[in-house]
Amino acid sequence: MQKQVTIIGSGIVGAVTAYYLSKDPNLSVTIYDEGIGQATKNSAGIISPWLSKRRNQRWYRLAKAGAALYPEIVTDTQMGYSVYQQAGTIVTRADPDDLQALYKLALERRQSAPQMGTIEKLSAEAVQERIPLLTAPQPGVFVSGGARVDGDKFAHNLLKYAEKRNLIRHKGKVRLGDQGQLLTVNGQQSYDTLILAVGAWLKPLLLPMKIIAGVRPQKGQLIEMQLPETWADDVPVSMPEGERDFIPFTRSKLVVGATHENDQGYDLQVSSLVEDDLFASGLKLDANLTKDQISQVKVGTRAYTRDFAPFFGPLPDNPHILVASGLGSSGLTTGPMIGKLLADYVQTGAHDWDQYQLPIETYLEAAD
C-alpha cells in the first residue's frame, strides 16, 4: 500500500520536495496551493551565496548546498536556459580596498566551495564588457558559478516532472483542525505525512493547533522590463553596491529588484512609488532605460524569522507534520536543499540537520 504524503504550498520548497518524492514508487503525493502571493513566483532569482556577509554559518552551509543542487536538478529535468543559467555573478565595489577584500573573501571561500568556479577581479571597463547594458559600471568580482533562475518556471517544471510520476495537484485553500486534521473544500483528507511549505502563511495555518510560529511576512516587489536590444545567454547577473539587483535574463528581459518591505503585512498591491524607486535604481546602471519598457511589476510575500534564518522539520509533538519557513529573500538558494532534506526524512525517517539550523523549537511555541 502506498504511503500518502500531502504537501501544502508549491513554491520552491514544496516543488523540490515533490520532485524528489516523485522518484519513489511507494509514495502517493498530493499538493495543494491557493496560488496567491507566492514568494517563489515573484523572486529576483540570483543564486550566488558565497560572497554574503552573513555570519550565520548554518545558513551559509545550507545556502551553499542549495546552490550546488541546481545543476543536478536542471540536468535531470532537462530545463533550458530560460529557466536556469550559470552565467556568473558580478558583485561590485566602488572602493578599491573593499574590492580587494571581496576578492580575497571569494578566493578563501572557493576552497570549500569549488562550484564557485573561476574568480576574477574586474575593472569597470571589464564589467561593462561582460554586461553591455551597463552605462555606469563599477569594478567588481566575477564568480563564474553564480547563476540566475526564474523561480516561477523552475517550480512549474518540477511539478510537471512529478505529475508524470506520482503527484496529484489541487488548487485551493486548506486549513488545519486542532489535532492537525487536513480540511479542504472537499472535506477532511487523510495523510500519512503532511508537509507545510507555506512560507509566511505558516503562522495562521498552525494557530488552530495552538502553535505559534515565529515568522512574519515581508513584501517584495520587482520590475520586469522588455528591452529593444538583445544579448547573449551568458551575460552575468549584477549585484551592484547600493542598488537593486540587475538581472539580464535570456535575450531581452531585464529584472530589477527586489524590495524588502517590513511594514506591509500580506499586502499584494503594486506600489507606484516602489515601481518608481526600482526603475530609478535600474536607471543608475543603464541610462537608456525608459519607463514604458516596464512590462510587469511582481509582488510576493516572504517569510522571515527574528534571526533571519530558516527552519524546517517535524513538529516537536507531531512527527507526521513537517514544516518549513523563514527562508526570506534567499529562498531560491536555500529552498532546494530544504526540499531535499524533507524528502529524505519522509523516505528514511532519519535526519542530520543540526549543521543547517537551530533546534526547531527556537521558532515554535505553544499558544496560551
Residue spans of the language-model regions?
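Active-site substrate-recognition segment that forms the wall
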Residues: 6, 15-23, 45-46, 81-84, ...
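Core beta-strand elements of the Rossmann-like FAD/NAD(P) dinucleotide-binding domain
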Residues: 185-193
